[in-house]
């Protein structure tokens, strides 16, 4: 059982640049620096809200170096989720055909989706001291051509209850998708998206990279403070016509160059329910 999306892992040739970007834009704080021999990387972890972002920089050969050699740029390499029993979650994933490796009290889970390694990390539940302008991460997005197949792989690997899943469609961004909501009443999920318009940004990304992580999404109380911290051209803002600039937009999308290779959406509190199956839960401004 998974309870929340608790981290993103970023493969990067320059961890310091990524860390500094998250500190500058989101007020994130460094909480850990160590080596991960099994990944052939050094790791710098920043706290962003109640969630963590791990920057992995190669210090030799291994899967992080391989991913960077293939992609040629920093990118979301894996997504993490918390579980009350990571060992049990690992057994479920292994029985579903995933490749599983232990790292201390957490587990790396690798699924093959359309020939690509899609990686996750399952960690114990933990109370974290919040830092910065975010409240918490709640979503990591996987792009896949075979949406049903990818959803089934993730469902089976993590023992998720598909009766809680909901669908999502966007003509504006050119996709259809499924939100694999972990628990009733909570936003945390993996999003599986199939681009349907090759002329749009997501469609072009998928055509170039294939099955892969695309972005993360978070919630924050004060999106205006995040707006103010981002250089011109580094963010797309969704503020309804007529709403005062002093009030929160509904959401923003922070572009990858602004955050060290990570595309991050940030929504105001409750707003994500608008596209998560329960629009009545959205608090109006």
Q: Model-derived features: where do they sit?
A:
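Vicinal oxygen chelate
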Residues: 4-13, 44-49, 52-54, 64-145, 166-169, ...
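General N-terminal targeting signals
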Residues: 27, 45-47, 69-72, 159, ...
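Amphipathic alpha-helical segments
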Residues: 15-29, 88-96, 146-162, 226-233
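Hydrophobic secondary-structure block in the mid-to-C-terminal portion of proteins
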Residues: 142-173, 182-188
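N-terminal beta-strand motif that seeds the catalytic metal site of vicinal oxygen chelate
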Residues: 1-19, 74-81, 121-155, 211-216, ...
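An N-terminus-focused feature that recognizes amino-terminal "leader" regions
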Residues: 1-63, 266-268
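ER-lumen resident redox/N-glycosylation machinery signature
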Residues: 29, 34-35, 60-70, 127, ...
